[in-house]
Amino acid sequence: MGVYLGKYCYIMIIMLVLVLGKEVRSQLLKNGYYSTSCPKAESIVRSTVESHFDSDPTISPGLLRLHFHDCFVQGCDGSVLIKGKSAEQAALPNLGLRGLEVIDDAKARLEAVCPGVVSCADILALAARDSVDLSDGPSWRVPTGRKDGRISLATEASNLPSPLDSVAVQKQKFQDKGLDTHDLVTLLGAHTIGQTDCLFFRYRLYNFTVTGNSDPTISPSFLTQLKTLCPPNGDGSKRVALDIGSPSKFDESFFKNLRDGNAILESDQRLWSDAETNAVVKKYASRLRGLLGFRFDYEFGKAMIKMSSIDVKTDVDGEVRKVCSKVN
């Protein structure tokens, strides 16, 4: 009996250490981390993102997705920025990632002013915030102080959310990162400025569940529209906005699309069919001039701060890379 209790206590201590370790790591982040060491850090990142945005506004969803994919694999440590045949960028879910050149540009500008000070992980977190702000979305204070990870493995990217995931699987993947159902729905609201290839949803139009029919959850009028955009004989590479109603504006229309059966991705539309996620979607979709529902812009900022604190690295297990695409 004593042996079993001893093993149980040992396991509980290990679990407690892991939980407290994550909590301590997230507390190492703070607003204005570079206020003394590199006072212009955030403004340099902002101006860099803005210059790229002015040339191509679609870079905003690319940067947001890049940050999301970084945080869900190895934590928010810039590991997705590392190049290599076996690095995260080589994983199937990461093919087509955009915005890498923006981060490299910002890093080069920062190195010229504050060499070896600002991490690539922080640049990415700041750039994601700025990309939302430039798309008429909310802005929020980004706690900084992350260090860059030294490991990037394509095999670790299997836990990234997929457009084929059920709601249960989506919930579990987010829960594994310390994010709840409210965070899940809120963060997927980023699809209001997102894009995807026809390849990732064409099956819903022509051969749903191998029946030869269309997904019945798609509204008839929207189905006609999607078939025009993505014909059955196309190569699947055409880019389609995930929120056709207001593709370049960060707003609540994405949630109204779920309500109306106008979601592009199956995983998004499924949020309407689950009672728990449906309740959150309704709160966002029904909001009218701040009188009803949740404020999506405010809640999104909170969820992003929470997500950007996932498994951050410290001086012990991280570094400040000189070049974001490779470890020092």
From Swiss-Prot:
Binding site for substrate: P161
Encoding gene, per UniProt annotation: PER25
Residues binding Ca(2+) 2: T192, D243, S246, D251
Compartments in which it is found: Secreted
GO biological process, one term: hydrogen peroxide catabolic process
Enzyme Commission number(s) of this protein: 1.11.1.7
GO molecular function, one term: heme binding
Protein name, per record: Peroxidase 25
